[in-house]
Amino acid sequence: MQQEYYDLDLERAILSSCIMSEEAYASIAGDISPKDFSLKAHQDIFKAVIACSNNKEPISVSFLRKHKKIDEQILAEILATPSMIDLPAYVNELHEKSVKRQLLSFAHLLPTRINEDRAVSEIADEIGKEIFSITNRVNSRDIKDVDMVISELFEEFKKQKTLEN
């Protein structure tokens, strides 16, 4: 049985939730990246969502268009998709499919790498590093992006300063 390593309905539901609720996006922002989406148009829309968030702009259609050229048909499909309640489960499934796609893509390169005229230890070391790079995100999903941490820290400092006054 051929397994699918992408789910466009799943991707649309995640994007719909992020667009409909900034809180939903904030809850999963560090868990996925644009490359986790299999469809380039979905990657572009998620990049625009990230840009809106980073610029402290509303995550809305008008602002999304400002940051990235958006495929209007794909955006309409996303907006017609109901947002979901169990977003973390959907995000986890998206991430799992993404890692499997990356591993499958890497596996296709192995015969070429193995046939290179280099020492086996060098080839094995390189392959090990690449596999670690792909799978490391699976084990470090709770680690937030440094820009996000600094932004959150700065916001907390502002709140504390306001409370002191």
Regions found by a protein language model. Give the residues of each.
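Noncatalytic partner-interaction/assembly domains of nucleic-acid and motor enzyme complexes
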Residues: M1-V99
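Signal for well-folded cores of large energy- and translation-related assemblies
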Residues: I19, H95, F132-T135, F154, ...
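Phenylalanine-focused residue identity feature
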Residues: F37, F46, F63, F106, ...
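Interdomain "pre-motor" coupling segment immediately N-terminal to P-loop NTPase/helicase cores
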Residues: S83-I150
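The Walker A/P-loop phosphate-binding site
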Residues: R141-N165
